[in-house]
C-alpha cells in the first residue's frame, strides 16, 4: 500500500490526471515517491502513444505533432516548462547566487524564460515531426520517462539550494542515491523492453545528461530547487529525442 500511495502521489503532483481520492503524504512520501517518477512518465507516454494512433487517422503529421505537444502540456499542466522558464530567467541573469534564486521565485516571466520555453517546444515539435512514423510510438512512449528520470537524478544528486521552504524541498531532502538507483533500474528495464540494446544505450546517455545538467545548474546557485528539477526534466526529454533521432 505504501508504494501504491507514493505512485498516486506522484501522479497527482506531476500530472493533471485525476486521482480518484485525496491522498495525504508526508515529506518522506514525496521524496521517496520520486522513485516512481519514471512510472508516471510511462503513463504520460502511454497516453500520448494512444493519442498518436487516433490523431494520425485524421490529421497530417505536422498537425498531429502540434496536437501531441499540446496534449503533453495539458497532461503535465506545464509544470516542468514553468520550471524551465524560471530556471533560465535566474541562471542566465548573470547576477549573484541570491539574486538568481530570487528571480527564479518571481512569478513574472522574463525574456530568458520565454526564449527557453519557445526553443524547447519548437525543437521537440521538430524532432517528433522528423522521426519516422514507424518509430514515433516508441519515442512518444519513452521521452517522458527520460524527462522524469532527469528530475529524480536532480533531486537525488544534490542539495536544496534555498534557505527555508520551497516546492522542491521535500523531493531533494528525502531523495538520494538509493532512489536514483531504484528509479534507474525501472528506466533501464522499460527502455530495454521497448528498444532492446538501443534502449539501454539511450537510457545510459540520458542518465549522464541528467547528472551533467543538474550539476551545471547547481554550480550556479549552490544546489537544486523545484524549478531546476523541472528544467532538467524538460531538457532531458529534448536530449532523448535528439539521440533517438540521430540513432533512429
Curated annotation (Swiss-Prot):
This is Adenosylcobinamide-GDP ribazoletransferase. It is a multi-pass membrane protein. It is an enzyme of class 2 (transferase). It catalyses: alpha-ribazole + adenosylcob(III)inamide-GDP = adenosylcob(III)alamin + GMP + H(+); alpha-ribazole 5'-phosphate + adenosylcob(III)inamide-GDP = adenosylcob(III)alamin 5'-phosphate + GMP + H(+). Keywords: Cell membrane, Cobalamin biosynthesis, Magnesium, Membrane, Transferase, Transmembrane, Transmembrane helix. GO terms for biological process: cobalamin biosynthetic process. Its main location: membrane. It comes from the Bacteria. The lineage of its organism: Bacteria, Bacillati, Bacillota, Clostridia, Eubacteriales. It comes from Acetivibrio thermocellus (strain ATCC 27405 / DSM 1237 / JCM 9322 / NBRC 103400 / NCIMB 10682 / NRRL B-4536 / VPI 7372). Pathway: Cofactor biosynthesis; adenosylcobalamin biosynthesis; adenosylcobalamin from cob(II)yrinate a,c-diamide: step 7/7. InterPro entries: CobS (IPR003805). Its cofactor is Mg(2+). One of its GO terms (cellular component) is plasma membrane. Belongs to the CobS family. It is found in: Cell membrane.
Amino acid at each position: 500500500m505504501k508504494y501504491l500511495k507514493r505512485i498516486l502521489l506522484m501522479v497527482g503532483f506531476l500530472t493533471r490526471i485525476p486521482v480518484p481520492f485525496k491522498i495525504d503524504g508526508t515529506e518522506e512520501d514525496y521524496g521517496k515517491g520520486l522513485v516512481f517518477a519514471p512510472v508516471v512518465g510511462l503513463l504520460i507516454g502511454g497516453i500520448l502513444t494512444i493519442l498518436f494512433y487516433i490523431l494520425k487517422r485524421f490529421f497530417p503529421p505536422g498537425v498531429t505533432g502540434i496536437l501531441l505537444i499540446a496534449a503533453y502540456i495539458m497532461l503535465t499542466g506545464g509544470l516542468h516548462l514553468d520550471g524551465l522558464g524560471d530556471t533560465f530567467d535566474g541562471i542566465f541573469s548573470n547576477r549573484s547566487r541570491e539574486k538568481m534564486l530570487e528571480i527564479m521565485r518571481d512569478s513574472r516571466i522574463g525574456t530568458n524564460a520565454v526564449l527557453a520555453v519557445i526553443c524547447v517546444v519548437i525543437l521537440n515539435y521538430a524532432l517528433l515531426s522528423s522521426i519516422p512514423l514507424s518509430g514515433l510510438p516508441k519515442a512518444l512512449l519513452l521521452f517522458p520517462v527520460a524527462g522524469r528520470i532527469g528530475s529524480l537524478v536532480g533531486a537525488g544528486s544534490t542539495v536544496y539550494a534555498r534557505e527555508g521552504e520551497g516546492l522542491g524541498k521535500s523531493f531533494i531532502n528525502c531523495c538520494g542515491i538509493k532512489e536514483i538507483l531504484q528509479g534507474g533500474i525501472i528506466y533501464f528495464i522499460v527502455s530495454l523492453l521497448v528498444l532492446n540494446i538501443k534502449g539501454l544505450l539511450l537510457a545510459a546517455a540520458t542518465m549522464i545528461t541528467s547528472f551533467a545538467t543538474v550539476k551545471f545548474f547547481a554550480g550556479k546557485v549552490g544546489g537544486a530547487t523545484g524549478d531546476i528539477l523541472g528544467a532538467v526534466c524538460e531538457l532531458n526529454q529534448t536530449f532523448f529525442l535528439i539521440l533517438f533521432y540521430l540513432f533512429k
